[in-house]
């Protein structure tokens, strides 16, 4: 992750804009869960149509802001990654043309170049930048439904460990995707079951709106943890490939 931070802050003005955009995206991402919470707990009890319309318009505006800032951030990330890694890829191509290589050496360098190209897309950097705000979802969960926060934290750890150990566990990509869907569904069942029990059996302030809203937040947090773990592994592969290519370029 040090290399990621180093690359990010090569252009401090762009890094600042990316962090600000990520903060706004994180705030706007709270809209669906807060909308569900307020509609179920406030509108259904009051029945005032103008309140529902105002809430719906507000939520749509926030989602539109999130989409716009994600698009803008993706463009900035692509420009930054191209500025950093395109010279390395160009230097590799030039060096390969000027050097006699065995078939195995050529394949290894070609694979390293493909790793760099694949790991420089905007999604990977965006997933890393979103991680602090995924933790913000957990903090919000603590205030809404603390049991959902605990359950989500456990599933996030499981998801991140499985993603990090995917190669050691010999999991294929399809199996990993199926496992992610299974964990997402299992977490929803656990959160709703525990929440329903608390509403009916315990003397607590948890409401149906808070329960459903907290489940949406927990799902976003789990997705964010999964994406962060994948991005972290991609960054590690990119660093190894970059080191391999630079070593080859500098070889006399």
Predicted regions and their residues:
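Cytosolic ends of transmembrane helices, especially the final helix of ABC transmembrane type-1 domains
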Residues: 221-248
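Extended non-transmembrane interhelical loops and adjacent amphipathic helices
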Residues: 1, 78-118, 167-169, 239-250
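Membrane-integrated ABC transporters
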Residues: 1-31, 45, 49-54, 73, ...
């Amino acid at each position: 992750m040090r290399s990621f931070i180093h690359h990010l802050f090569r252009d401090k003005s762009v890094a600042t804009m990316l962090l600000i955009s990520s903060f706004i995206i994180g705030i706007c991402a709270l809209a669906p869960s807060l909308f569900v919470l307020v509609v179920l707990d406030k509108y259904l009890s009051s029945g005032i149509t103008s309140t529902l319309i105002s809430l719906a318009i507000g939520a749509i505006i926030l989602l539109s802001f999130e989409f716009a800032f994600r698009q803008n951030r993706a463009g900035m990330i692509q420009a930054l990654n191209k500025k950093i890694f395109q010279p390395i890829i160009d230097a590799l191509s030039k060096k390969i043309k000027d050097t006699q290589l065995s078939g195995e050496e050529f394949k290894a360098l070609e694979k390293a170049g493909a790793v760099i190209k694949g790991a420089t897309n905007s999604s990977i950097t965006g997933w890393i930048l979103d991680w602090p705000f995924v933790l913000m979802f957990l903090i919000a969960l603590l205030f809404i439904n603390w049991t959902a926060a605990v359950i989500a934290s456990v599933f996030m750890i499981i998801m991140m460990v499985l993603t990090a150990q995917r190669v050691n566990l010999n999991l294929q990509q399809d199996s990993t995707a199926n496992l992610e869907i299974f964990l997402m569904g299992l977490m929803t069942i656990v959160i709703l079951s525990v929440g329903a029990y608390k509403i009916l059996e315990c003397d607590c302030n948890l409401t149906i709106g808070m329960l459903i809203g907290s489940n949406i937040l927990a799902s976003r947090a789990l997705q964010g943890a999964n994406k962060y773990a994948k991005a972290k592994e991609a960054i590690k592969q990119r660093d190894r490939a970059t080191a391999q290519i630079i070593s080859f370029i500098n070889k006399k």
